[in-house]
Amino acid sequence: MEQPWPPPGPWSFPRTGGETEEESDLDVSPSSSHYSPVPDGGAQMYSHGIELACQRQKEFVKSSVACKWNLAEAQQKLGSLALHNSESLDQEHAKAQTAVSELRQREEEWRQKEEALVQRERTCLWNVDAISKDVFNKSFINQDKRKTEDEDKSQSFMQKYEQKIRHFGMLSRWDDSQRFLSDHPYLVCEETAKYLILWCFHLEAEQKGALMEQIAHQAVVMQFIMEMAKNCNVDPRGCFRLFFQKAKAEEEGYFEAFKNELEAFKARVRLYAQSQSFAPVTVENHAPHSGVGCIGSAEPLPQNPDSLQCCPPAPLCSVDSVVHKEDDDRMMDTV
């Protein structure tokens, strides 16, 4: 049977048997009074554009984290060698210094790329015509089979474990996060990081800055764990405890790299949300959730905030099933 295009994303996951969610005032599902459909073509084009932007952001976070983590590793190694005064270590010390210099150069290159990305987003708001051309020039018939299968697996994973991922995103303490991942090690994967990153965009579009910062913290945590596993050439599920050990000890280099990447990521999310493409949408212009990154219409914002209707449906933006409202202040602690 033919699958719909684009495939459903985490913002439109169907509830399985017996699973219920309290109706939220942000509910824009077809059964809601706020629902007002628009032509499928426009929704698909816009969803595709948002997905491209979010994917670009995820790749940037991944590369930036890799650079910062490798630099922290090299600095720690250099520091440990400095404690020894043996001449036999001179050669290794020189190699470590060279590695630090190279990594600092790479870090500077990524800093320049980040500045270029920020400048481009400030000067180039969403171009619907460009999105349209990209969509209609792309062949959906001859897609690479492996890529399609990977996307299907990713969507299936996020659909199956959506509630668990959201729960992890709301945790605010290192010990709580480590304990939760110990109980649910299958969540230590790229799909969890992707879901949390996309959630950050939606929360910032809703002007829920404090909650966005909490979810951003957990998104960067997951990305750092994945990078550590890559560097150690081990399964991420087997090394996440090492990350929390370093984080709780606030080891020099590692913790600083984490904080810097977290602040940089939050700044990029805010910048994206300020563009028309990630603005909250009016009820009249709201589009059905046809893709992972669909946030809504690219129409200019009205001046009256009462007329705005934010896009994420109740299953995503309603967190009362995970944490009670009176715990909001506690949840905002990021350490």
Curated annotation (Swiss-Prot):
InterPro entries: Cdc37, Cdc37_Hsp90-bd, Cdc37_Hsp90-bd_sf. This is Hsp90 co-chaperone Cdc37-like 1. Residues 1-42 are annotated as: Disordered. Residues 277-335 are annotated as: Required for interaction with STIP1. Residues 84-120 form a coiled coil. GO terms for cellular component: cytoplasm. The modification Phosphoserine is found at residues 32, 88.
